[in-house]
Structures are given as C-alpha cells and as structure tokens.
C-alpha cells in the first residue's frame, strides 16, 4: 500500500512484537473490570439519586482505567518506560516500530510511520462517519411525521447528542488526521513527523475513546445534546460521564497531534522551502491545529469541572448554590466556534491545493489565501458569544460580538475569491476531485450567507434554537468541510493506496449525496423559518411536509455515502494501478515513488521553485534532489 512489504521482518521490537489491537482491547477490558469492581466496593453500585456521586465516581474511574489499559496493551508506554530505565532503542527496534515489512498487520499496531498513521486515521474516520450516519437516519426517521415516534423524548435527545459528538470528532480529524499525517511530511520534504511516537499516540487515543463514547448508549445516553449545557449536564445520567471522558481524551490527543504537526512544519521543511514556497495545504493544516491547541483545552477544562461537580459535590455550575452556568457556556463556546474553523480550514486548503492542478494555472493570489486563513484564525477566537445572545450574559457585548462575527466573512470571502480567481480562464480538467470544488463552492455560499444573517442579534433572537440554525451549520461543516474531505480522498487516493479512485462509482455516490444534502437542509431552512424548534421530536402539523422532504433527502445522503464508501473499498482492493504522478502535480508527494518508501526520500530534496508554477515557462517541474542531512530550517 504505502511502503514496501516484502522482505524479512526486523529482529527488533522486543515486547512490541506481542502487542496489537487485540492485546489493547484485552488489557483495556481487564483494567476497566478491576477498576469497576474496586470503585464499586468503595463508592457503591447504587442507582438511586442518593448515590449519584458514588455512581459517577465508579464510571469515571472505570473509563479512565479502560483508556490506560488500552494504551498499555497497544504499547504506548513501552518507549517512555524504556527511556526511564535508560535503555536506548536499537535500529532494529525503530524499524520494527515503523512497521517495516509487516504488511497489513502494522495497521493494527502502535506504528510510528506517518503514512501508516494517516491510513489508520482514515479508517477510523470512516467508521465514525458510518456510526454517526446511522444515528442521523434514526433521527430523521423519527421526524418523518408528527405521528411517528420510534423513540421517547429522552431517548431522542440522547440519540441526537451521541450523533452530534460523534460527527464533531469525525469532522475534526477527517482531513488533518489522514492527510495531515500522510501527506504533509512528504509535502515539506521530511522523512517522518518530528515526534513519531506522539503521532501514533494521538491516533490510538482516538481509538481508545470510541468505546467510551459508545458506552453512553447503555448508560442513559447524552440527553443534553452535544453541547451538554449546564445545569442539564450535572443532572444527566451516567452517559454524561462517557461524554466527559471522551472530551478529555480527545483534547489530549488533539494537543499532542497539534504540537507534533506544528513542530514538524516549522523545523523540518526541506532546504529552499521558504514560507512563500510552502504549499497552501500545509498552511491550512498548521492553522487548524494551531487553532485547536488553545481552543480544546478550554473544552477539556469545562468537562473536568463538570466531572468534579458530578463526583465530589462542588457547585461550579450550580447557580442556586452560588455557582454560575455561564462559566460553562463561555468555556464551551471558546472552543465551539474556533472548532468550526478547525474543521473548515484544512478542507478548504486541500481543495486550494489541488485546484491549480486541475486548471493548470497558479493558485490565484497565494498571499491572499494565507492572509485569509490567518484572518479566520484570528477572528474565530473573538466571536464565541454570538452563541449566547439569548442567555442574558453581558448584553452590552452583543454589538461588539455581532461586529466581529460579521467581520469574519471578510477573510472567508478572500478564500472564496481565491477559488474563483484560480478558476477564471483556467483550462479545467473535469475529473471528479475538480467537480467537487464546484459543489463545495455552492454549499459554502449558502452556509456563509445564512451565517451572516444569523450573526445579527435581531435575526438570531427570532431563529435561535430553530431548525434554521441546524441547516446553517450543516451547510458549513458538511457542505463545505466534508465535501472538501471527500475531494482530498479522491485526489490523494492514488498516492495513499497505489490505485486510482473509481470515479464512475464514486461519482454516483458523490452526486447522489450532494442532491440529498441540498434537499435535506433546504427543507430544514424552510421549517426553521416557519418556527420549528431543534432538540424536540414532537412538532406541529405545520412542519410535516418540510420534515418529510428533509427525511427523504437524508435517506438519499446515506445511500450516496454508502456508494462512495463502496467506491473507496472497491478502488483500494481492485482499482487500476496508479503511476507515481497521475495528475502531473508539482508538489513533493507526487515526486516520490508509489508506494512511498519507508523514509519517503532516498535523498532529501532542495526546493528551487514554488509549487504552483503551472503554465510558467521558467518554473521547473520537479525539485532538485541532493544528498543532505535530515532537518530543515525555521
């Protein structure tokens, strides 16, 4: 797939030879079972309200030990323990840890090769999207008619909450996880990430949180919705403990991954790769993780405090006892709105990366693209309170936050103009990744324009909490973000898998899902404008036709995505063998062989031109390769 798999497996590895996903699951189960038993004896297994603190302590301890056991069983702590004991890692150990010559087995192990980690992220993301999509179908089925009720109100809210947080996790990692890991190190001329073990650690932390999150189904669910507002969170069943632990683990994973990516790009770029020669996708990934590094710890802090309230009787969020639930709302949205751009920026950057390839002309105003990305990052941390207009918190700040929210349309508009300017008079090569750009632009316009309206206090007062808001953020996160990720999959598929993507089958899936998407959320715009609220399953007959339309559209999305996933599997297993550079692209990942060697380059490259010089006579098609020491410059 990505590296040569023939030849003897290295003799090194030590205990790592016996650790894999199976041992991780076994150790996690044993640790969790022991923790549950001991914690139950200490704090009680009672289910009544009089034992709520003890019950939550039991589950949080159980989930914590599950995660520790899982990470122990996968081998995440072997390296640190060896370092503490003063044992150096041999070359054979390093090669084994990188997955050399281990075939498919390396995808089920703690493997440090950034290409393997990228593929692991891709598979995990697809599984999360499938689970989240199934939950979405259950939600829309419940809403198809005012007389249809497959859930009770509490279960409906729990399903909505679980769907929301699964999809948020999936969309956050859908581009930076697979392609930030697989592509970025090659794209900047590096042999691997700066911290390969931390790279693998970030991935397996994500895997460890999936069972914790899904356990909420059996613990009363997440009836608060994905935002888990207080005091609802403190009153929720033990499924809320699953939510708390999921967010804590995810924040740790995101911080580790973000620091690793930023360090890699800053310190390991190839000689000659100045910032003006650095591909725009690299900028997008760095901006995304750079925004996540300060944003997600605030989310983590909000959940730590919530966990303390649930397990020790503190009242940080209990207004009646002297706490303040606005504290939670501020901490949550300090993460919640930057998180939108953590998702959106790398998806748009991926499309800006390959757009010049398919129009055979340079990216229009590279500097404007960089400034637009930087502007979004800067303003995204100054708009969080537009989610709080209706809460009564600091009403004197409504106007300033309305202004900053409207201002963020300026840098996003700059990115839109970069797309349009690049398309202008280009010689379009109408392959499926290119056509996805048109779909994204349509969705991006709708998501952006509806967002401008919602930024105004009077409009927000009328539409806040309605299906209109649901449609708006789906047009942004799914219509632009997910479509960008699908385009990235189609574009880099030949390099990741060594095979061409089946554009016929994949095209059917893509366009069916796009038709369904617009039908679904146009219907939601309509019922939202008419007044249908979010977060409740019962509604007036006034909204029934719109919900029938939206549900039919949702089924269409699901069918289209299943076809698209089938195209991925079919192409991966039996697709046409790809050449090293089927698109005729100039960036470094397309200049190395397919499958990509373990260390990416036999000799490290020296960059002599920008990556978008299509149609420029003096622009060289390939970088100069010269044997130099590993490393780069800041």
Question: Residue spans of the language-model regions?
Answer:
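Membrane-embedded and interfacial regions of multi-pass energy-transducing membrane proteins
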Residues: 2-634
